[in-house]
């Protein structure tokens, strides 16, 4: 099992929300891989007083670049669900390449709609951050 964090999950972790702090602490203590697609960082990262805390979080996760395969899977998802957001499609595509992956998100409904319309995404579990 591995975890993928989207922007909402990172915000929850940064703000020390109980659920995300617990998920993160358990994952780190059990050497569970936490993946953050690189596009999520662009949506989450802001300059300012929290940069050191954000950098510390980033050092503890695997930042995954968007490969051509991920981009194509996301494009298929956007074809099948034109109302979906590009970053959500990229997060789902990224997670779908790892078996037994769980995505933590603040928008489970958006990701569930993508999962339901793209067969390659069916194995991804989605949890509220």
Protein language model regions, located:
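Acidic, metal-associated active-site segment
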Residues: 44, 85-102, 110
